[in-house]
Amino acid sequence: METLELQGAKLRYHQVGQGPVLIFIPGANGTGDIFLPLAEQLKDHFTVVAVDRRDYGESELTEPLPDSASNPDSDYRVKRDAQDIAELAKSLSDEPVYILGSSSGSIVAMHVLKDYPEVVKKIAFHEPPINTFLPDSTYWKDKNDDIVHQILTEGLEKGMKTFGETLNIAPIDAKMMSQPADTEEGRIEQYKRTMFWSEFEIRQYTHSDITLDDFTKYSDKITLLNGTDSRGSFPQDVNFYINKETGIPIVDIPGGHLGYIQKPEGFADVLLNMWG
């Protein structure tokens, strides 16, 4: 893996291929290896970069998180993630780059576009679970508060079951999300990673400071992506609302919420049609 030294962290990332830079931002998984099957499909067209977000995988913190980062209203980590992606983009290319964020990674991508538009050539939001600008935002904020409380008091298994039911996660995704790692060490790491995401991201990222105006001013750069196998899920409803209010197009893409793993060939074909 490659390394970029940043304030407070060593950011690690996979890099394959040649051509214009395309950065993938992972969601709850946090690690870029989840995009490697997709990267193989795109490496003849792009320099594909898949990031281990700060606090995940091989990326290392060199300074501790501030105590306030676990506050439900803290924007520290999502803003830090966005700054990391912008600094990575600048280190890799003198030109604006392509960016795709999936799930909570797409919320990071929104903050990249809002705060660092100069690094973005084109950007895609794949099934973002953000609620800040929705008419029923308070309802969804309260639901996420309840989910995190359940995880912390009743355990991860019960809380994640409620999470899946509340967001109407498709069976194809629920099965993959609940699949344990192959080794005991892997299962321990998986548990720690999911608990970290629960405490530091479910509430903070989904209710972070993004408005519809943040999209309309850059609408020519944005594509919304909804999976063909995750119809009816909350993240798709978010994209439908953005589309209705701004006119930014939605493109159907193969697979579900984890379509880049489930159907990497078809996922890549859509990206090449968009950006190739």
UniProtKB/Swiss-Prot annotation:
UniProt superkingdom: Bacteria
Residue stretches in coiled coil: none
Keyword hit for Chloroplast: no
Occurrences of domain AB hydrolase-1 (ranges): 20-137
GO MF term list: hydrolase activity
SUPFAM superfamilies: alpha/beta-Hydrolases
EC top class, as a word: hydrolase
E.C. code: 3.-.-.-
Region Disordered, annotated ranges: 57-76
Presence of the UniProt keyword Hydrolase in the record: yes
Family: Belongs to the AB hydrolase superfamily.
Identification of the protein by name: Uncharacterized hydrolase SAOUHSC_02900
Organism this protein belongs to: Staphylococcus aureus (strain NCTC 8325 / PS 47)
